[in-house]
């Protein structure tokens, strides 16, 4: 069986770029999933590995990072230290492991891969009146810029 770190490397290695769309509840509490409240173009994740055990995650166009950018070393030794990451061939993500009323939100990130295309969905819940409510949804359709055979852009919604 392939270990989680190896699946993570196979899924995510690449220079991923796409347009990020964020949907957030308005003042009345309505969550409109057809009209984004924020678009970030481009959203870029450059994920590279220097050897079998080490790499770098470098992101820009990020919704929650200071200045929209972040860079982190990644390694087999520290991968999934919190136990919230999961990988399968062609799918990977991370999830909050529990609800903590002291934290401002919890979430799930789901990535689905097809060839060198990647669809990422981020779901964020926030507390409201003692309950958790889905507050924000982020979606990015990525293409890998490192691909030798780039895939064409997807048609706009509603087109054949």
Predicted regions and their residues:
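Soluble ligand-binding/transfer domains with enclosed cavities or grooves
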Residues: 2-160
């Amino acid at each position: 069986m392939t270990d989680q770190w190896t699946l993570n490397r196979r899924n995510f290695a690449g220079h991923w770029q796409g347009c990020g769309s964020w949907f957030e509840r308005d003042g009345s509490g309505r969550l409109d999933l057809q009209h984004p409240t924020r678009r970030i173009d481009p959203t870029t994740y450059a994920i590279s590995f220097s050897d079998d055990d080490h790499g770098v995650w470098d992101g820009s166009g990020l919704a929650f990072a200071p200045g929209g950018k972040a860079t982190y070393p990644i390694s087999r030794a520290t991968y999934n230290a919190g136990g919230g990451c999961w990988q399968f061939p062609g799918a990977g993500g991370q999830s909050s492991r529990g609800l903590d009323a002291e934290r401002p939100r919890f979430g799930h990130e789901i990535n689905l891969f097809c060839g060198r295309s990647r669809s990422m969905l981020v779901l964020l819940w926030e507390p409201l009146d003692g309950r958790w409510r889905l507050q924000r949804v982020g979606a990015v359709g990525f293409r890998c810029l490192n691909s030798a055979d780039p895939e064409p852009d997807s048609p706009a919604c509603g087109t054949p």
